[in-house]
């Protein structure tokens, strides 16, 4: 049985893996990393992607690598994009296929 699960958003991950276990509110996190509360709220609500600035602030605050949060955002964005263009991408030829077609047309 193939069940579809949408990619976890950065906001869901941030909330579930960091904020809830540590008892952090959006207000406290925003205040501590010196960003507007609305920025954190929008990230949590999946209305805003994580910027480099936010990713670096979160990485410093939570003691992760500089790449941790931006890599997470990249993975989430990639999975979302794949869902949108999957069928079109699959219908495109590969480089090898175009080369083979070119060889056959010259024969």
Where are these regions (language model features)?
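Short alpha-helical "recognition helix" segments of helix-turn-helix
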Residues: 25-30, 58
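Key DNA-contact positions within bacterial/archaeal DNA-binding proteins
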Residues: 27, 38, 67
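Alpha-helical residues within the helix-turn-helix
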Residues: 20, 31, 42, 60
């Amino acid at each position: 049985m193939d069940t579809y699960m949408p990619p976890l958003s950065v906001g869901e991950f941030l909330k579930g893996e960091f904020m809830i276990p540590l008892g952090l509110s959006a207000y406290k996190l925003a205040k501590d990393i010196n960003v507007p509360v609305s920025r954190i709220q929008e990230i949590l609500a999946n209305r805003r992607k994580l910027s480099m600035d936010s990713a670096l602030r979160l990485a410093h605050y939570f003691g992760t690598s500089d790449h941790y949060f931006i890599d997470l955002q990249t993975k989430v964005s990639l999975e979302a994009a794949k869902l949108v263009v999957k069928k079109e991408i699959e219908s495109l030829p590969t480089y090898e296929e175009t080369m083979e077609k070119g060889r056959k047309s010259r024969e």
